[in-house]
């Protein structure tokens, strides 16, 4: 079968220049199966893929993609994941004749950073649509890193994203999603369970959206106030889609930066993103808004730190709209020594009743995820 591809950035002879390529249809299936075979992992395909239901993208990691430790910034990886997700979901939602739309990111499920990615390696991002409801699309994304000198590849990230199609004529109008065809009825039922679970969790998150991070003067070390941090960012054209709304990947990268600052202030060592709990996008952010991204420590185990990150948007040029909560998530960071081995972290000292409550909630999430990992029997690549 012919390769249906569009090259977005050309390779320049003799130079390492970033490139993206989009592949659809059966060629994408071949790429995905080849990657998984190279890692000795077998993955059953979830749906019957038609052209546009699966894409593969690749880009070489440059020095400006690095964090202060020299590895690829976790926010950069999150941004690449979201770019793949928005392409495939927008393409699918416009696959039938009807009102044109753009897919908006509503939620990112828990994302684990399985292995660091290095500058000079090639990031391979593959995305596929695995479930559709009446008004939402589930996209599963895998990220592989390739050392182009040795040819070795490794799985670095897995993520599940949910999108909703918004009309180009009226961005407050959610359109219907074209259905996909499943190989087995069980796969559709499993997808429906995932949809209902994330829908319930999103509702629970909205109930907690009244929290505000307040600065404290002269806080004591190891307290929540000591490491809490904020970034203020004016949303410009380069942050937005063609329709004037912030890319979800831009928001996620800013959230990861704030979480990293909080973690570094708390332990004062090299830190890396270990995982991201579900990121919920509660409302759209328009061009021209001033966004405040605030992070605070909620829980520490022996070698990990949980940081809650909140994104508030202030439409400064629109007096009719007040400041609102746009997104929220929990990030988990680990402290590393010079050899890249995990270090014990200073234990958080919660002071107020709210801080103690958040600490216990974080402990519950930590123990739940620890039990899930210990009971996970799927062979790892």
Curated annotation (Swiss-Prot):
GO terms for biological process: acyl-CoA metabolic process; coenzyme A biosynthetic process; fatty acid catabolic process; long-chain fatty-acyl-CoA catabolic process; medium-chain fatty acid biosynthetic process; medium-chain fatty-acyl-CoA catabolic process; palmitic acid biosynthetic process. Isoform 1 is expressed constitutively in brain and testis. Isoform 2 is induced in liver by treatment with the peroxisome proliferator. The N-terminus is blocked. The modification N6-acetyllysine is found at residues 169, 199, 284. One of its GO terms (molecular function) is protein homodimerization activity. Homohexamer. This is Cytosolic acyl coenzyme A thioester hydrolase. Pfam families: 4HBT (PF03061). Signal peptide: none annotated. Residues 51-169, 225-339 form the HotDog ACOT-type domain. Transmembrane segments: none annotated. Its EC number is 3.1.2.2. Residues 343-381 are annotated as: Disordered. PANTHER family: ACYL COENZYME A THIOESTER HYDROLASE, CYTOSOLIC ACYL COENZYME A THIOESTER HYDROLASE. Its main location: cytoplasm. InterPro entries: Cytosol_ACT, HOTDOG_ACOT, HotDog_dom_sf, Thioestr_dom. It is an enzyme of class 3 (hydrolase). GO terms for cellular component: cytoplasm; cytosol; mitochondrial matrix; neuron projection; neuronal cell body. Catalyzes the hydrolysis of acyl-CoAs into free fatty acids and coenzyme A (CoASH), regulating their respective intracellular levels. Preferentially hydrolyzes palmitoyl-CoA, but has a broad specificity acting on other fatty acyl-CoAs with chain-lengths of C8-C18. May play an important physiological function in brain. The lineage of its organism: Eukaryota, Metazoa, Chordata, Craniata, Vertebrata. Gene3D superfamilies: Hotdog Thioesterase. Both HotDog ACOT-type hydrolase domains are required for efficient activity.
């Amino acid at each position: 079968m012919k390769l249906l591809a569009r090259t977005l950035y050309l390779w320049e002879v003799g130079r390492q220049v970033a490139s993206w390529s989009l592949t659809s249809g059966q060629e994408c299936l071949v790429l995905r199966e080849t990657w998984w075979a190279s890692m000795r992992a077998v993955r059953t395909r979830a749906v019957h893929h038609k052209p546009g239901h699966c894409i593969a993208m690749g880009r070489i990691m440059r020095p400006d993609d690095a964090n202060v430790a020299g590895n690829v910034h976790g926010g950069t990886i999150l941004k690449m994941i979201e770019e793949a997700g928005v392409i495939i979901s927008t393409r699918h939602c416009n696959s039938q004749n009807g009102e044109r739309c753009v897919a908006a990111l509503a939620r990112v499920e828990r994302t684990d950073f399985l292995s660091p990615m290095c500058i000079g390696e090639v990031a391979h991002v593959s995305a596929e649509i695995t479930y559709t409801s009446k008004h939402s699309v589930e996209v599963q994304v895998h990220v592989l890193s390739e050392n182009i000198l040795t040819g070795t590849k490794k799985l670095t990230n897995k993520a599940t994203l949910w999108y909703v199609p918004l009309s180009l004529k009226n961005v407050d109008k959610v359109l219907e999603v074209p259905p996909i065809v499943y190989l087995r009825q069980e796969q559709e039922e499993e997808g429906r369970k995932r949809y209902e679970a994330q829908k319930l969790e999103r509702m629970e998150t909205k109930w907690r959206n009244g929290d505000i991070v307040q600065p404290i003067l002269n806080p004591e070390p190891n307290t929540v106030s000591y490491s809490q941090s904020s970034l203020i960012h004016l949303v410009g054209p380069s942050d937005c889609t063609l329709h004037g709304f912030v890319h979800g990947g831009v928001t996620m990268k800013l959230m990861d930066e704030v979480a990293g600052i909080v973690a570094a202030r708390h332990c004062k060592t090299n830190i890396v993103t270990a995982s991201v709990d579900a990121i919920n996008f509660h409302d759209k952010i328009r061009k021209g808004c001033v966004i405040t991204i605030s992070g605070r420590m909620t829980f520490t185990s022996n070698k990990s730190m949980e940081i809650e990150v909140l994104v508030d948007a202030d439409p400064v040029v629109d007096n009719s709209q007040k400041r609102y909560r746009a997104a929220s998530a929990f990030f988990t960071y680990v402290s590393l020594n010079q050899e890249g081995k995990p270090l014990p972290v200073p234990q958080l000292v919660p002071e107020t009743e709210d801080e103690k409550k958040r600490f216990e909630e974080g402990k519950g999430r930590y123990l739940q995820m620890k039990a899930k990992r210990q009971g996970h029997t799927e062979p790892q690549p």
